């Protein structure tokens, strides 16, 4: 059991126990009171391009707020990301001693396993860590440390929004809390920091959601166009006829009656005026549906590596192809799990082992 007031952190530097009793962000009230900007509202291609350029230049806030909006507003992205994230979160886990472990090492691994089992929110921690799969990185803060039955354990582990951080570039890119002069380094034994790149490069460009932003935007346009199409072409045209010499007030009364019929299927008009219903205009919504389907297939390919575990079109969805795509999903799950295990071993298991060693 650690009894000294100083121990060595993962960087080899001395760490005082009183420094980790409270969360690092406890005094950063400005971050806690921030309200998201929701950049998806009124998003256009030019605004999106500008937002992505700003992220590459160091201002990542709007990009990661957009990522949050995408997962919240696009049901297909939410469903596919949920499949991938929960495929990892539902796996069984264990604390495994090293190869050719001594009896003492095996005993230590078993003790660590019991301590980890005592974390009430560990399943939630695993799920929140997988937030990095879509966004490139995810940070969870220890809400300080406390003694539980004589052992040091985190009070709670809280997911923090990616918009709280900045990604200064150097010899090695870091994740830091937003602030002046390049931000504030994350406190040792204070964070679980998981990095999950979808492609090589700087973190602000390597997130999976960077691939999904354009299909998301195109799909939004197509959904809006389809809604407008259905509104125009799916409702019978209503024409009102007023007699020669009708006053402006009478014309306005007729117009209001037409509007009421469109929404309430009821209305009144003055005697002598007429209402005619024409057939709905003819049109084909297939073009809009085709674009929406293309966007969703692209999203599924990017997230799950294929489409046949998500959608069946009755044409290409054979059992053999479905099995192939399911194997791809398993490969992704296993790769995700390896990255997750490495992060949790470094940022959660190791601190618990050191503080209770």
Place the predicted regions along the sequence by residue.
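Structured, contiguous alpha/beta core segments that scaffold functional sites
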Residues: 2-78, 86-88, 93-99, 103-261
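Hydrophobic, well-ordered secondary-structure elements that form the walls
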Residues: 344
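Short, composition-biased local secondary-structure segments
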Residues: 261-267
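General structural feature for long, well-ordered alpha-helical segments within catalytic domains
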Residues: 222, 250-254, 295, 340, ...
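Surface-exposed loop-to-helix/strand elements on domain peripheries
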Residues: 242-245, 267-341, 349-357
């Amino acid at each position: 059991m650690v009894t000294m007031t100083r121990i060595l952190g993962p960087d080899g530097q001395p760490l005082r126990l009183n420094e980790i009793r409270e969360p690092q962000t406890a005094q950063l009230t400005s971050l806690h009171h921030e309200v998201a900007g929701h950049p998806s509202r009124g998003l256009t291609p030019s605004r999106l391009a500008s937002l992505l350029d700003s992220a590459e230049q160091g201002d990542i806030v709007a990009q990661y707020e957009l990522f949050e909006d995408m997962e919240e507003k696009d049901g297909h992205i939410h469903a596919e990301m949920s499949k991938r994230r929960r495929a990892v979160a539902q796996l069984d886990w264990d604390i495994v001693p090293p190869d050719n472990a001594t009896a003492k090492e095996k005993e230590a691994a078993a003790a660590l396993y019991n301590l980890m089992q005592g974390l009430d929110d560990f399943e939630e921690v695993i799920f929140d860590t997988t937030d990095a799969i879509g966004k490139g990185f995810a940070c969870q803060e220890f809400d300080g440390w406390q003694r539980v039955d004589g052992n040091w354990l985190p009070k709670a582990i809280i997911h923090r929004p990616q918009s709280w951080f900045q990604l200064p570039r150097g010899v090695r890119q870091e994740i830091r809390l937003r602030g002046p002069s390049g931000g504030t380094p994350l406190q040792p034994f204070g964070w679980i920091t998981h990095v999950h790149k979808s492609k090589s490069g700087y973190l602000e460009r390597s997130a999976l959601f960077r691939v999904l932003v354009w299909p998301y935007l195109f799909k939004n346009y197509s959904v809006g166009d389809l809604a407008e199409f259905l509104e125009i072409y799916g409702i019978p045209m209503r024409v009102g006829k007023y007699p020669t010499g009708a006053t402006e007030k009478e014309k306005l009364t007729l117009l209001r009656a037409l509007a009421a019929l469109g929404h309430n299927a009821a209305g009144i008009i003055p005697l002598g005026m007429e209402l005619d219903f024409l057939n709905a205009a003819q049109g084909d919504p297939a073009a809009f549906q085709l674009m929406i389907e293309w966007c969703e297939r692209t999203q599924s390919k990017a997230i799950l590596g294929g489409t046949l575990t998500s959608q069946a079109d009755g044409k290409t969805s054979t059992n053999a192809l479905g099995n192939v795509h399911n194997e791809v999903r398993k490969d992704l799950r296993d790769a995700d799990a390896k990255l997750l295990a490495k992060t949790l071993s470094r940022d959660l298991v190791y601190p618990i082992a050191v503080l209770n060693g």
